[in-house]
A protein has these predicted regions:
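Anion-binding alpha/beta catalytic cores of soluble intermediary-metabolism enzymes, centered on
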Residues: 1-283
Length: 283
């Protein structure tokens, strides 16, 4: 069993939906038995959540006593209300889980939702879990990528964000040719795990991808050049020209239902909501 895959799951903020999601998800019969699952959190609090859900008549949940739990007895006065306590605990759960995964070959990490505001009010100044992961693993070149397999066709849908948890007004200043090239490298490498010579699309930043500088100049100033430079470095890769963001995900939406045979294998979104809105609607 030691060499079997290990999945480490954090409970996230205990006043949020994380514990409930875990108890429901791990009741599924579809999870392979050969996978070792370890929950990082507070066992007493997880049992309390289980009993509360059962009192509501919810039956399709797993008893925490049947789970392997890394029991961190971090003081949280009230797990029913979001507070600095729940924010601090969720941060420490993730820190501990990261160390477990770093020391465990053939392992993966699943994070439950946290409250970014409560992290900061508890003294942990990170804009999200991604940023803590990047720092903890000494990996500055990371990406937030969303992948899902269509239940209708088996086709895999991939979207990577060039920028993540920053105000939208800062996006044009955060983007540059080097950032776009590094994110294209990550996206292509990931998509290539599932398909040889994957097709990659890049969404424009401005409406209609700037309309040649009329609706914004970032595309003309550096985004088009970044795509051109990446193509030169990767001549065999299938990277499209810049696509208007309002139509960039249309073929993906059709492919999810099996109505399109030639969707992109990966899409690079230039900011958080540009990518997350279509991803959540489609999947």
């Amino acid at each position: 069993m030691k060499n079997n895959p290990k999945i480490v799951i954090t409970v996230g903020d205990e006043a949020g939906v994380g514990p409930e999601i875990i108890l429901k998800a791990l009741a599924s019969r579809e999870i392979p038995k050969k996978i070792n699952i370890l929950i990082v959190g507070n066992k007493k609090n997880l049992i309390s959540k289980y009993l509360f859900l059962r009192s509501l008549g919810i039956e399709n949940i797993v008893d925490p006593n049947q789970l392997a739990i890394e029991d961190l007895k971090i003081t949280v006065k009230n797990v029913k209300e979001p507070s600095n306590d729940t924010g601090n605990a969720s941060f420490l759960y993730l820190k501990h889980a990261i160390e477990i995964v770093k020391k465990s070959p053939n392992s993966a990490l699943v994070t439950s939702p946290i409250c970014k505001k409560l992290w900061n009010s508890a003294g942990h100044n990170y804009s999200g879990q991604t940023e803590l992961l990047s720092e903890s693993c000494d990996s500055p070149n990371v990406g937030m990528l969303f992948t899902a397999k269509s239940p209708f066709t088996g086709w895999r849908f991939n979207t990577l964000l060039a920028t993540t948890h920053i105000p939208i007004r800062e996006v044009p200043y955060k983007l540059d040719k080097n950032l776009i090239n590094s994110k294209l490298d990550l996206l292509y490498k990931f998509c290539n795990k599932f398909k040889d010579k994957p097709t990659i699309h890049v969404a424009g930043l401005n409406p209609h991808a700037g309309e040649e500088g009329i609706l914004g100049t970032e595309e003309v100033d550096f985004i088009n050049q970044a795509i051109h430079d990446w193509k030169i470095k990767n001549p065999l890769a299938n990277l499209s020209e810049l696509i208007s963001p309002d139509s960039c995900w249309i073929s993906s939406a059709k492919a999810w239902r099996g109505n399109n045979t030639n969707p992109p294998d990966g899409i690079l979104a230039l900011y958080h909501d540009q990518g997350l809105i279509p991803v959540k609607i489609i999947t």
